[in-house]
Swiss-Prot record:
Keywords noted in UniProt: Isopeptide bond, Molybdenum cofactor biosynthesis, Transferase, Ubl conjugation
Residues annotated for substrate binding in this entry: 156-158, 168, 224-225, 240, 247-249
Species per Swiss-Prot/TrEMBL record: Haloferax volcanii (strain ATCC 29605 / DSM 3757 / JCM 8879 / NBRC 14742 / NCIMB 2012 / VKM B-1768 / DS2)
Entry EC no(s): 2.8.1.-
Pathway: Cofactor biosynthesis; molybdopterin biosynthesis
InterPro entries: MoaE_sf, Mopterin_biosynth_MoaE
Result of knocking out the encoding gene: Cells lacking this gene do not grow anaerobically with DMSO and do not show DMSO reductase activity although dmsA transcript is present, indicating lack of maturation of the DmsA apoprotein into the MoCo-holoprotein. Their growth in the presence of oxygen is not affected. Disruption of this gene does not affect the formation of SAMP-protein conjugates.
Gene3D superfamilies in the record: Molybdopterin biosynthesis MoaE subunit (3.90.1170.40)
Protein name: Probable molybdopterin synthase
UniProt record, GO biological process: Mo-molybdopterin cofactor biosynthetic process
Positions of crosslink type Glycyl lysine isopeptide (Lys-Gly) (interchain with G-Cter in SAMP3): 240, 247
Length: 261
């Protein structure tokens, strides 16, 4: 799922204009004042939903942050457009010079923004991918009718390797554009040549990934569990050994590139 934020006066209007230009399922997320999100009743429920016979639904709840919401959306939507989140670590369009954390385009007003250019811009950035994104992609594969197993691996940021270690606060990953993806595609194709292996999907996140967050995913669609388990293990081992991705570690005491150690 590709994500683009828009901040400044008219951000929500520009999100609506841009959504009409995108080819795929689009979700919009609007930043609301705290008072606007207070539930109408306090019946002790954490979430409330309404569902119509034709599949339309509404919902509200508590204890949700933007990253978690994007994770939930990523398996179902091709695009997410965010209105009014200047601190989000996503590519962002700034209107009228509004400050934001990651500005990739600017416009004086929402009406002056070139939506065709923004539609191309959103596709040029790293997508937001989760394990569920890849699992749903595997289930949608034409070969899934022959599959009796889906095996997955998720790598995450480990705070410590031993009790005496300085805690790791975050890892930052960088890669050469296109090179890492090409290598992962080649590994997947080689693993898919095995008997009983139908599809292999991989994704490695880039940028800053905080302690406890997910880093890398491997998903294997296979006829049976044995080839699925073997292939998911070989897949992550080969990804770590062969794909050129550079890692910087930030602990409570220091910051360093791991390949320099």
């Amino acid at each position: 799922m590709h994500v683009l934020g828009i901040v400044g006066a008219g951000a929500t209007t520009l999100c609506d204009r841009l959504a009409a230009q995108l080819d795929g399922r689009v979700a919009t997320v609007e930043s609301l004042p705290e008072s606007a999100t207070e539930p109408e009743s306090t019946d002790g429920v954490a979430a409330a939903y309404g569902l119509s016979p034709d599949g339309n639904w509404v919902g509200s709840g508590d204890d949700r942050d933007l990253d978690g919401l994007l994770d939930d959306l990523s398996a179902e939507y091709d695009y997410a457009l965010l209105s009014g989140f200047p601190d989000a670590r996503v590519p962002t369009v700034a209107l009228a010079g509004v400050d934001a954390a990651n500005v990739v385009a600017e416009a004086e007003t929402a009406d002056a923004a070139d939506v065709a250019s923004l539609a191309a811009e959103i596709d040029s950035h790293e997508p937001h991918v989760t394990l569920e994104t890849l699992v749903e992609r595997a289930k949608a594969d034409p070969l899934e009718v022959y599959a009796g197993a889906i095996a997955t691996f998720t790598g995450r940021v480990r705070a410590k390797e031993s009790e005496d270690d300085d805690p790791t606060l975050s890892l930052e990953f960088e890669k050469y554009d296109g090179v890492a993806e090409s290598k992962m595609d080649a590994i997947s194709e080689e693993l898919e040549a095995r008997d009983g292996v139908l599809r292999v999907l991989m994704h490695h996140r880039v940028g800053v990934v905080e302690d406890g967050a997910d880093i890398v995913f491997v998903v294997v669609l296979a006829g049976h569990r044995r080839e699925a388990f073997r292939t998911v293990e070989d897949g992550i081992d080969r990804l770590k050994d062969e794909v050129p991705i550079f890692k910087k570690e930030t602990t409570t005491d220091e910051e360093f590139w791991v390949h320099d150690r």
